[in-house]
């Protein structure tokens, strides 16, 4: 229990002690009845309340892509400075192209050879057809010529496919950046023999840092609350699907750019009982770094027609939370309530209070359930009301 809560509980207890002592205090010296004690109250008026949901969050890269060799050979050159920005398509590494250039030339020759054979088979098939028409040659010889022509046509297609493969392999000797981002350290030194298997093909990685992801988690209760508030927001025509977040650093300073929640998990984590959430935020100056811990605060969430009371008004007993309410006869009543959420200066009350109720905020120690008080509405010319209360008390004497 906090110090303020302890004080409020003590105040509540003291009020009951005063109540027990009322018969002894009923008559002041000289037989005059003392005036009811003066207390400050707030009039309960439902209003829209912004609610803050704040979570521990972690920064993750928007994309982190491994750069791997797609052909083997000797690594000739590294064309970038480690840890610097590169653009998508920029050549990062060069692998010895000589063997792949030779394979390309071989494939080109095979295409030419296949084309020549195909053209010859076309001519042979045409002559065979003419001889059959002249009844000089059998149909079987003609059919064989047609089959040879079709086989040579397929051979041309296969040779061209080999040529495309050779062209691709030669192009793969220039390893380019798949995305724009920051490079990591090289994994293989120049002059090394590299392969295409998982253990030897990794050359470096590129990390995209603008934008970045902010990952955090809701509890199941908070997820339900936010879903309800988003539904209410959507019912009023507001955009309920794009919740904004503010990012706070460890020193309490806010990041320059707001983020937008773009993903919410469809199921709870069975180990933590939380719902994974992800937001995306601009990071043009790379102020946010993958792995960095921050605080994420959800913005623009409001509870419609909410009831709040100052923190000083809410007290705790063994039976639960309660406040002191002044009824229409200016008599103090104990009102059990349910505090839904602690705000900056107030408590959001989910049950127990209604519009128009007057809740005691100051002078609780003087308030006794079942006894009258002089209520002064807090924040509405307190001094004038206090003077008016004194005059009313004087008139009763």
Swiss-Prot record:
A family per Pfam: HlyD_D23
Gene Ontology terms, MF aspect: transmembrane transporter activity
Stored SUPFAM superfamilies: HlyD-like secretion proteins
Keywords: Antibiotic resistance, Coiled coil, Periplasm, Signal, Transport
Annotated localization: Periplasm
CC terms in the record's Gene Ontology section: periplasmic space; plasma membrane
Induction: Repressed by BepR.
Main location: periplasm
Signal peptide positions (record): 1-26
InterPro entries associated with the record: CusB_D23 (IPR032317), MFP_Efflux (IPR051160), RND_pump_MFP (IPR006143)
Coiled-coil segments: 98-139
One annotated GO biological process: response to antibiotic
Quaternary structure and interacting proteins, as annotated: Probably part of a tripartite efflux pump, which is composed of an outer membrane efflux protein, an inner membrane protein and a protein that expands the periplasmic space. Could form a tripartite pump with BepC and BepE.
Function (record text): Involved in resistance to several unrelated toxic compounds, such as dyes, detergents and antibiotics.
Similarity section: Belongs to the membrane fusion protein (MFP) (TC 8.A.1) family.
Name assigned to this protein: Efflux pump periplasmic linker BepD
